[in-house]
């Protein structure tokens, strides 16, 4: 019997289930818990602990532990266990938890090569995070693996538990993320109408709110502590232990009106030598006030998802709550009341995602490379002198199915056919054999139901046919449509302007396959150090596409082929697939060199887009400054409440201290910057004409103050003529304006790039901005080469060094960052 496995790899807890097509089974931890804390603890002897033991010890000895690393998946943030001098990646940590959970399975399931495993990821996960999860599964030694979005898995769990038609909303609030899914069920078939969520919203944020707003103020009032308490490494263990105590108090408030955050001894003294302890009364009312903002954020996410689906609350029958924090009644009541939708607790909130993942795993064609879904249509060719075949629905969600006769030849008069169940002995009786004849069969059990077809001649004698066996799988539910959670595109340059060619748009049904053609923007010679870069971005910002989040770079390097040259303008044929999970697969062929480059090999790299959030405070500060300057410029001419919202997001982001090393705090700040960018993009879209005028005026002012003196007379005249052309484009609402503007900016850059002193200034800035470079060693080597070039007055070499620095720099989305653009063009 085949078994299918589902793993909910959670921020706080993980769970694993199996499904054999009929029955679900949850595998408990050795401690007999339904879920296993996603925690690793390594003692001073190097022994590893997982689960509850690891989580409890992590509170007392945080430098020996790794927790909540799921939030850092897809980034270059190291997970440091300083006490044992071990540094792990988030992928390595996740691999340990996957290996642990997979080990709960019986040996016959683990070692069966046919076992397929679905690992769930939040809908808000981007391509880098999904790739990191697949890497973790490979490290864990799990065989056949596919990813699935957590809200889809939750929907499958709901469908397994309760039949019935209608629209329902899944509110999946876990330890780290919020996922919202809206689904419609009709006769056992379910369509996802829309999904949304918040990447950094979960139980961990509730814990941190208690720590920041109750515990820290109490400590500062009670004891003599330094002003830099939050970032002072001396107090790291104390604060981690306090956070654990806050979390335990939060859990107790699910069943009590009042509790105490208590730690009799935190093994730390204050500046006056007094022993530090915790003894803080907290009420349910206190907690409600602290988490109100996050609950409001989750309610707004649900409303936005309803809007995406084109639905009102009146169209939705119930909210199904999933995830540990939804145990809290105040949260459930508040969400249901604000949305005016009835609350439901029909699934186990702690295990629903793992259960649904196992059910979904049964629907995957594990023999296919793309891990697509099994076909819902079945057919057999019985052959013979009748050219006989039978068509049927191979995977119905209900208890009945029809088998249809297809005749290609002439049938003998009086011929009949019959269908028997090999499971129950049921028989249909004989029915006249003719094209289009049908027999309805009963599916007696979930999973595979096997039938055999018999054919008889006019005298009742058996007629030999070829294939006569039909297997129909009665499924728990059938997913008709999975919408894409985001828009994903490839950046191209068009007349100097960056544009996105979309592979998939938000809410497009998945999976999606297609073919796109591009051209090389520059030549690439075999074995050279250069590359052609397909920059993959996620988002809907169209006028300034580099404001969209970069999620990876597919690079064809000169070292990837041994002979020939890809000439500028050469055709690049890109076959792509966006899978059910939202993962992107790219294969690029280059006819001119007969080359083929596939993303599942070494050519797809996440490194260019990853951030180390343990060392990102300077980068965040720079991003905040850039976006704030843009917002201030727009606010001088336009009054829009979204600008105030964007500034509020930036204020939150700018509160990160310059020496902040907590990855979660830094990542939340960067997410706030991304939200501010989206709000600004919305304002630009709604006020396109005045925004265009501002952009043109700014570009002209820059030319007049910084560039005109360096320009040749013909260049200045040409620039002025192009300005007039751009102005006419604004006045006539022409779509060519952005092309003209980018050409103007490009001319500014080209003139400045000729000036040696400008190149030196740019080099000095890049040499100092170490936080903008993931590969610090390569950055240092290039800086050394640049300094040597300056000493030798070799400015052409310096220009080459600056170009290389830009190519490995984390893109800030700055319009003046002209060297950071992709180098492929439209076909």
Give residue ranges: language-model regions.
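Conserved AMP-binding/adenylate-forming core of the ANL superfamily
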Residues: 87-96
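Oxyanion-binding/catalytic loops of NTP- or PPi-dependent enzymes
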Residues: 1-75, 79, 87, 107-827
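Non-catalytic, mostly N-terminal accessory regions of nucleic-acid modification and defense proteins
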Residues: 98, 106-107
């Amino acid at each position: 019997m085949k078994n299918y496995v589902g793993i909910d790899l959670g921020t706080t807890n993980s769970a694993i289930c199996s499904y054999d097509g009929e029955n679900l089974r949850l595998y408990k931890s050795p401690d007999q818990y339904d879920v296993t804390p996603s925690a690793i603890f390594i003692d001073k002897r190097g022994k590893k602990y997982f689960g509850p033991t690891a989580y409890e010890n992590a509170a007392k000895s945080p430098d020996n532990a790794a927790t909540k690393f799921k939030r850092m998946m897809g980034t270059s943030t190291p997970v440091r266990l300083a006490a044992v001098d071990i540094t792990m990646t988030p992928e390595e940590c996740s691999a340990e938890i996957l290996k642990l959970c997979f080990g709960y399975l019986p040996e016959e399931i683990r070692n069966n090569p046919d076992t397929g495993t679905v690992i769930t990821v939040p809908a808000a996960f981007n391509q880098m995070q999904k790739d990191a999860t697949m890497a973790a599964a490979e490290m864990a030694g799990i065989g056949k693996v596919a990813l699935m979005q957590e809200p889809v898995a939750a929907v499958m769990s709901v469908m397994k538990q309760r039949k019935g038609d209608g629209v329902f909303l899944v509110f999946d609030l876990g330890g780290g993320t919020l996922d919202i899914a809206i689904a419609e069920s009709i006769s056992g078939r379910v369509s996802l109408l829309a999904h949304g969520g918040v990447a950094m919203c979960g139980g961990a944020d509730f814990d941190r709110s208690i720590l920041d707003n109750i515990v820290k103020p109490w400590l500062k009032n009670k004891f003599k502590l330094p002003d830099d308490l939050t970032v002072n490494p001396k107090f790291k263990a104390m604060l981690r232990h306090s956070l654990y105590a806050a979390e335990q108090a939060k859990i107790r408030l699910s069943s009590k009106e009042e509790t105490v955050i208590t730690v009799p001894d935190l093994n730390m003294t204050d500046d006056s030598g007094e022993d530090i302890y915790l003894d803080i009364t907290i009420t349910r009312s206190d907690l409600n006030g602290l988490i109100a903002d996050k609950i409001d954020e989750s309610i707004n996410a649900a409303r936005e998802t309803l809007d995406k689906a084109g639905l009102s609350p009146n169209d939705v029958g119930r909210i199904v709550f999933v995830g540990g924090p939804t145990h809290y009644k105040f949260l459930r009541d508040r969400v249901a009341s604000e949305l005016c939708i009835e609350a439901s607790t029909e699934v186990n909130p702690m295990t629903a995602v793992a259960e649904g993942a196992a059910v979904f795993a049964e629907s995957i064609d594990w023999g296919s490379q793309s891990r697509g879904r099994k076909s819902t249509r079945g057919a057999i060719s019985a052959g013979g002198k009748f050219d006989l075949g039978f068509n049927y629905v191979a995977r119905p969600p209900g208890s009945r199915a029809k088998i249809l006769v297809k005749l290609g030849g002439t049938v003998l008069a009086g011929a009949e056919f019959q269908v028997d169940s090999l499971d129950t002995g049921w028989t249909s009786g004989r029915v006249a054999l003719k094209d289009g004849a049908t027999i309805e069969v009963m599916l007696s059990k979930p999973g595979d139901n096997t039938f055999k077809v018999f054919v008889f001649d006019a005298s009742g004698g058996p007629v030999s046919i070829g294939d006569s066996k039909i297997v129909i799988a009665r499924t728990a539910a059938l997913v008709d449509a999975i919408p894409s959670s985001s828009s994903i595109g490839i950046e191209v340059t068009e007349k100097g302007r960056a544009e996105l060619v979309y592979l998939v748009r938000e809410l497009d049904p998945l999976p999606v396959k297609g073919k796109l053609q591009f051209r090389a923007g520059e030549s690439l010679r075999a074995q050279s150090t250069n590359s052609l870069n397909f920059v993959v971005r996620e988002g809907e910002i169209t006028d300034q596409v580099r404001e969209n989040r970069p999620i990876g770079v597919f690079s064809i390097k000169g070292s990837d082929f041994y002979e020939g040259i890809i000439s500028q303008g050469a055709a690049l044929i890109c076959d792509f697939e966006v899978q059910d999970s939202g993962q992107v697969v790219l294969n690029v062929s280059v006819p001119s060199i007969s080359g083929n480059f596939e993303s599942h090999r070494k050519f797809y790299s996440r490194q260019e887009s990853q951030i180390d959030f343990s060392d990102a405070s300077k980068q965040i500060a720079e991003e905040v400054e850039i976006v704030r300057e843009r917002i201030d410029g727009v606010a001088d001419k336009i009054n829009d409440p979204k600008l105030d919202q964007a500034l509020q997001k930036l204020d939150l982001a700018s509160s990160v201290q310059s020496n902040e090393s907590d990855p979660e705090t830094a990542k939340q700040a960067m997410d706030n910057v991304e939200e501010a960018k989206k709000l600004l993009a919305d304002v630009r879209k709604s006020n396109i004409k005045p925004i265009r005028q501002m952009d043109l005026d700014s570009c002209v002012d820059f030319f007049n103050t910084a560039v005109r003196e360096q320009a040749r007379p013909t260049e200045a005249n040409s620039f002025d003529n192009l300005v007039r052309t751009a102005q006419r484009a604004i006045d006539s609402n022409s779509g060519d304006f952005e092309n003209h503007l980018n050409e103007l900016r490009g001319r500014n850059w080209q003139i400045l790039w000729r000036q040696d002193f400008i190149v030196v200034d740019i080099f000095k800035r890049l040499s100092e901005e170490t936080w903008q470079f993931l590969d610090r060693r390569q950055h240092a080597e290039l800086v050394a080469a640049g300094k040597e070039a300056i000493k030798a007055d070799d400015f052409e070499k310096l220009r080459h060094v600056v170009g290389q620095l830009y190519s490995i720099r984390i893109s800030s989305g700055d319009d003046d960052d002209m060297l950071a653009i992709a180098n492929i063009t439209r076909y």
